[in-house]
Amino acid sequence: MEPESIGDVGNHAQDDSASIVSGPRRRSTSKTSSAKNIRNSSNISPASMIFRNLLILEDDLRRQAHEQKILKWQFTLFLASMAGVGAFTFYELYFTSDYVKGLHRVILQFTLSFISITVVLFHISGQYRRTIVIPRRFFTSTNKGIRQFNVKLVKVQSTWDEKYTDSVRFVSRTIAYCNIYCLKKFLWLKDDNAIVKFWKSVTIQSQPRIGAVDVKLVLNPRAFSAEIREGWEIYRDEFWAREGARRRKQAHELRPKSE
C-alpha cells in the first residue's frame, strides 16, 4: 500500500504522531489502529519502503537544489550589476575625454565609493560564501553527506526536445496567465466566460514537468544490484507519472468550484 504522493507520507506520519500524543483514551480504538498499522506495514515490501524513503529524500534534495540555484543566480546578477555600474562610473570619472566636474562628478564619486564599500562588506560579512560559493558546491557537499547511504545526487541532462518542450510550456503558461489577468482586469470578464475558460485550460495543460527532470538520486552500483537499480528507476517514473495525472485531474476538478 504505497502513498499517492510524497505529501501523503508526511500526512501518515502526522497521523501516527497525533495518535501517540492523544494517548490511550479509547483502548479498543488504539488496539484496532495498532493491529491495522501492523497489517499495513506487513503488506509493504522492504524494497517499496526503501524506494519510498528514497523518493522523500530525493524530493527534499531537489527542493534544496532549486533554492540554492535561485539564490546563486540572484546574487550573481546582483554582483554583475554592481560591477557594471562601477565600471561605467570609473570610466566616466577617469577615461572620458571631457573632464567631469560639478555635481555630476560628486554623484559619480559617491556612486563609486558606495559600490566599493558594498562589495567589500558583502565579502567580509560572509554573504559571498553563503550565496555564491556554497550554492556552487551544493552537489559536492550533499554527496559527501549521503555517501554513507550508497546513493548519489546527480544532475539530469535534458535533451533538446525536452528543452524545447519546456520552453513552449513556459511561454504558453506565461501568455495564458497574462491573458487571464487582462481579460478579468480590463474587460471585466467573469470566470465562467468561454475565453477565460480556454486560457485556464491552457495553464493546466502547460504545467511544467515534475519528478526527476533536473536532479535525481542514483544508487551505487557497488552496493546495489542491477535489478534493484532498475526497480528504483521504474518505481520513481511510475510514481511521478501517477502524481502528474493526479495533479491534472485535481486541477480540472477544482475549476468548476472556482467558477
From Swiss-Prot:
Subcellular location: Endoplasmic reticulum membrane; Nucleus membrane
Positions in the Extracellular compartment: 94-106
InterPro entries: Spo7
UniProt cross-references to Pfam families, sorted A to Z: Spo7
Molecular function (Gene Ontology), one example: protein phosphatase regulator activity
Any single GO CC term annotated in Swiss-Prot or TrEMBL for this entry: membrane
Regions of this protein lying in the Cytoplasmic compartment: 1-72, 128-259
Keyword annotations from UniProtKB, A to Z: Endoplasmic reticulum, Lipid metabolism, Membrane, Nucleus, Sporulation, Transmembrane, Transmembrane helix
Gene disruption phenotype: Leads to inefficient mitochondrial sequestration and degradation, as well as to defective reticulophagy and pexophagy.
One BP term from GO: negative regulation of phospholipid biosynthetic process
Stretches for region Disordered: 1-40
Transmembrane segments: 73-93, 107-127
Annotated membrane topology: Multi-pass membrane protein
Function, as annotated: Regulatory component of the NEM1-SPO7 complex which acts as a phosphatase and dephosphorylates the phosphatidic acid phosphohydrolase PAH1. Essential for the formation of a spherical nucleus and meiotic division. The NEM1-SPOo7 protein phosphatase is required for efficient mitophagy under prolonged respiration, as well as for reticulophagy and pexophagy.
Subunit-structure text: Component of the NEM1-SPO7 complex.
Note: Present with 861 molecules/cell in log phase SD medium.
Name the UniProt record assigns to this protein: Sporulation-specific protein SPO7
Organism listed in the record: Saccharomyces cerevisiae (strain ATCC 204508 / S288c)
Species classification: Eukaryota, Fungi, Dikarya, Ascomycota, Saccharomycotina
